[in-house]
Structure formats: structure tokens, C-alpha cells
Amino acid sequence: MMVIGSIFFRRRVSPAFVVTLAFLFLVLRSVADDQITKKDGTNITGTILGVSGDQVSVESHASSGGTVKGLYYISDIKSISMATPAEVTKVQAQGVEPAAVIAALEPQVKKFSGLPADWVVQAMAQLAQTYAAQGQADRAVAIYNQIDTLYPGSKYHAQAVAGKAELSFKAGKIDEALAAVQPIVDQANKDIAPSPSDGATYASAFLVYGKVLEAKKKPQQALEAYLTVKTMFYQNPNLVDQADQLAKNLRDHNPGIGIE
């Protein structure tokens, strides 16, 4: 019996077994880590700690077994793969108290704003929308301006445009809001397979578009805009919930309305 146990023990700690375990550990660790690909093709794996100025701070695993921190210029980064923090995900659903949204998103936005990752800009936009809903339009505008400043000439500009258009609509500037979102709506109608981030931006624009159409007494077209968010640009659950509620309210006030 002891011989069998001894053989079993030796097999468990054989070099091949140890190598296999080490390989599995590295695979699992790499899956959990954030990934940065630089424009020169270099890959950095580790944990993104935050943004300071024009650099990203990353904690990586050293070959010695410890960790090492490095700074990388944002301008040198081609792409980033980073899971959305749980603090952000939990407040994306409709119905979360504004105070909870602000408490969850403010630290994340402060820590990661400027990072070229979709979830960061979406969190900034949601934070701005929450401020606007609380009557703090100046803080909302400041965040949208920050998006334009931190991501000049990027795809995220449309997110800021849609956000400012929402504020224009709330201020009663209907035509100004329409003029702002119309180019985004036109682009969305041409985009057959939008990315998740583009889908979220289009959803924001279509929500404003629908509200403008409602204000212009075009309920059928407004309903179509809301349903487009639900069926085509459904990547952000919070925006889908908003579209669903707007469509429901519209139907309640316009019995028998439908899409041709």
C-alpha cells in the first residue's frame, strides 16, 4: 500500500506534472490580465492601474516571480483589452439610484479617463447623463468636453456630440439637437455591423433623435427610433432600458401606433 502511495506521490510531483501546472497557471493568469498592444507591435500584459497625464500605469508580472510597474504613453498604444470593472457593470441597468451611479462611476472615471478603452468613455457618458438628470448640466457638459479633449479625432467624439445634443433638447433647443445627432443617425443607418462601442454611441443618438421626433409631433418615427435601439443597438443595457420605457410611454399616449 505504501509502495502504491509512493508511486502516486512521485507521479503527482513529477517534472512533467509541474510543468503542466505552471503552464496552466500562466494561461489562466494571462486570461485574467489586461492586455495592451503598442503601435510598434509590443504586447504588455498585466493590471492597468490607472492613467496619469498622458501615460498609463501597468503592474506586470516579473520573470523573477514578483511584480514590476511600468508607464506607457497613451499615444503609443494601438489597442487595449480590459474587462469592465464590476463597479461599472453593476450600475449599467436602468433603475439604479443616481447617487449610487455617481458613487460608483466617479472614482473609475477619475482613475481611468483618457484610457482608450470603450468602457471608460461609456462610463463617462453615463456619469454625464446622470448629472444632467440631476439638474447639473454644467457638470455634464464638462464631462462631454473632457471626452473631446482626451480623445481628439477619435470615434468617441460622436458620444460627446450625442450627449450635448441631449442637453440641447432638454434646454428646448429642438432643432439644434436634431442637427447635432442627424449625422450620427445617418452613419448608423449605413453601418451594417457596428462594434459594441459604436452601437452604444448610436443608441445614445437614436434616443435623442426619438425625443426630437416626439417633440415635432412625429410619434411613429419616434417609436421607430426607440425600437431601433432595442433591436439594432442593444449593446448598452441602460440605454436599451431607456428606449423600452420611452417606447412604452409613447404607445400609452398614442394607442394603436405601430411601425409601417
Where do the model's predicted regions map?
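Terminal, low-structured helical/coil segments at or just beyond the last alpha-helical repeat
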Residues: 219-260
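N-terminal low-complexity, intrinsically disordered tails enriched in Ser/Pro/Gly
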Residues: 199-200, 211
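N-terminal secretory signal peptides that target proteins for export/translocation
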Residues: 1-12
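Short acidic/polar micro-motifs centered on Gly/Asp/Asn
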Residues: 129-132, 210-214
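Compositionally biased alpha-helical segments
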Residues: 29-150, 159-175, 179-182, 188-190, ...
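Helix-start (N-cap) detector for alpha-helical repeat units in TPR-like alpha-solenoids
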Residues: 121, 155-158, 203, 237
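Bacterial N-terminal signal peptides
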Residues: 16-27
